[in-house]
Amino acid sequence: MMRTPIISLGQFKSAHEDLDKEIWRYHVSAAGKNKLPPEIMPKLLKQNAIDMFAMNPHTRIVFAAKADRDIQQRLTLGEVTDAFFVDIACKKHIRSISDIQNFDLEKIRKWMSARLKNMNFFGALDAAYYYDGTPLTDKKEPAVCWHGHFMVWDTTQKLLKKRQKKTNERFEAGWPGGKCFYFKNWTENIEGRAMYMMKAPQSEYSVALYKQHKETFDPETGEVEEIEIDKAKQYKRPLRPGSFKNIVDLYSRVEMRDILIAGGQGKSLLSDVINSAANQLAEDREAQRAARAEAIGLPWTPNPAPLAWHQIQKGPEQANKPAVLRTADDVVTNAISRLRNAPSSPLEKLRLGIKIES
């Protein structure tokens, strides 16, 4: 079964909520018992989304929502008119699953940025999981290919073609017939297409190798010769529960800031997304604590919301502290209302004794 591409915020939320359910369903099943690292599982909880762990579906949803909003704002203001979406995958970033600890994401980010040097771009690293790595690494065990998805704007197709040609001449994609640098112009639903960049791993892949016969003509001799060309076709299917352990291990120390990349005008977009997501996650965490205190009948004094606290730190001459605290109280109250209407995660339901729907 093919997974529907994520090209809207609504699809993004549904896909990551489903991923959250699948992970926890597997964790409490007989097949998944003791498979997922116990020290990693708390990082997947909604209450710990504030840690910005890249494999936490709730963290991803907040970051995607902020990216969607900030990109729409720039489209409305005319700062972004149309865009190109670029995919970059290189053989040097492919490893067997037993060798994944040797990945240096900082180096990969710098390498990806160099491919788009002097351009305005915003995007993220993603890990493609191959359940049979033989065609890529000559090893039967699963393999991982770190690659990048980027939105590039304020450039031309001609310039991107030059960059594409230069990159593809210097670097291999890692499978026969593959291209390291690929791009496509996108003029509609740009913010929706950007959601694909922000997703957590949703699928797993396989590669089938085959031979293609092609005739060549030698103009000097007039001879026609048939040659064989190595080719590869990739197949995709929804991520299987048995693959969760490898994916969770892969992302065990990865935060959102480790995989997001930007250059040129994209740096301000990245900054806006990270800051607004951090504030939203802090507000949500505060609301969760307030709701928990209210549920067990304990008194609750809200802490200042992140932006309000930042204002307080500027000094009394720049901020009216009582007013700021009232604002923080309002923020938490609003967040509590959102929280009450939001569905609980599977583990939170498990802790409360609520049956998880199958």
Regions found by a protein language model. Give the residues of each.
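Right-hand nucleic-acid polymerase module
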Residues: M1-A143, D154-S358
